[in-house]
C-alpha cells in the first residue's frame, strides 16, 4: 500500500473542434514526438472519412466505435500459494476507453500501404460494423475471461 497521498487524476480537456474528451484522448495517443497538430490533422481527417462512408456524425461514430471495442471484463494474474491464476475482473470505465483507443491505434498502425488517416478511418469503419482487429481483440479478451471463470472467486482485490 502506498504511504504517500493519492495522486489526483489528470483531467483531459475536450478537443478544439468537437469538444470531446475521447477524441482528445485519441489525438494524444496518435501524437508522436510532441507533434500535436499533425496528430489532430490525422484524427480529424480519419473521423471525416469514416463519417462520410457511414453517413454519421463524427463524434457519434467514434462513441459507437468505443462502445463496440471496449472490453467489459479482462483477466489479471493473481498469485495464490505457489501458482499464478488468471482471474477475470471487471474493467473500470476509464481503463475500458483507454484500452479501446490503444487497440484501435495498434490495429490501424498494423495495416499497411496507406497514409495513417486512411488506415485509422478503415479501422473506425470496421469497429463500427463490429468487425476488424479491434473488435477481434476485445472478443479474445472476453474469451480468456470466460475460460478462466472458474478462478473468479479469487477476484477480491
Swiss-Prot record:
Ribonucleoprotein is among the record's keywords: yes
Coiled-coil positions: none
Signal sequence coordinates: none
GO CC annotation terms, alphabetical: small ribosomal subunit
Top-level division of the source organism's lineage: Bacteria
Family to which the UniProt record says this protein belongs: Belongs to the universal ribosomal protein uS7 family.
Pfam families with a match to the protein in the record: Ribosomal_S7
Record InterPro entries: Ribosomal_uS7, Ribosomal_uS7_bac/org-type, Ribosomal_uS7_dom, Ribosomal_uS7_dom_sf
GO BP field: translation
Known function: One of the primary rRNA binding proteins, it binds directly to 16S rRNA where it nucleates assembly of the head domain of the 30S subunit. Is located at the subunit interface close to the decoding center, probably blocks exit of the E-site tRNA.
KW RNA-binding (keyword) present: yes
Subunit and interaction comment: Part of the 30S ribosomal subunit. Contacts proteins S9 and S11.
Gene: rpsG
Species, as recorded: Herpetosiphon aurantiacus (strain ATCC 23779 / DSM 785 / 114-95)
Protein name stated in the entry: Small ribosomal subunit protein uS7
Gene Ontology molecular function: rRNA binding; structural constituent of ribosome; tRNA binding
Keywords: Ribonucleoprotein, Ribosomal protein, RNA-binding, rRNA-binding, tRNA-binding
